[in-house]
Amino acid sequence: MDQYLVLGTGVGGGIVLDGHVWMVYTGGAGELSGLLVDFNAMGLPFPQSMSALWANRISAASITKAYAERKGLESADGIMLFDAYEAGDEDAKAVLEEFGFQAAAGIMSLQATLDLQRYAIGGGISARPETTEIIRKAFDDLYDPLAAFMPYGKPEIVTCKFGNEANLIGALAFHLWKA
């Protein structure tokens, strides 16, 4: 079984079991934008309560917004963020390290439930090799000290070979499979 994570405006996902998309009850299995990652924030009024959702922690939109806020900019994009990261900008480094931690923590929660062999990171942000490396390092930092106590295995975290097109290819494949 594989889990595919697509990071963009939100956090998409798909669980593939024995070569088929796992649909389950309503067909929404694997839609990860709504994964709760901050239970304390759920008690806040809207829109602050939205910070409890994984999409608002690790989507490309959320991390570029965080970078813009740290720099006092009206907006930023992924190219600006990663260029600054490569140039050694401490704000970019901090934003991407927090992104990696949030992504890894969510993957660890998924792993406790699904015990998957592999998580493939897709979406536009996955075009940067640093993305998967940052997530993988953060996952290692969380998992490795606890490995002896974990009843589930350590998954591979890889870059999806379809990158930014992953969700479109997945949607087409699903449509053709259903037809």
Residue ranges of model-derived segments:
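Glycine-rich phosphate-binding loop of actin/hexokinase-like ATP-binding domains
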Residues: 1-55
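ATP-binding/phosphotransfer module of carbohydrate and carboxylate kinases, centering on a glycine-rich
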Residues: 39-179
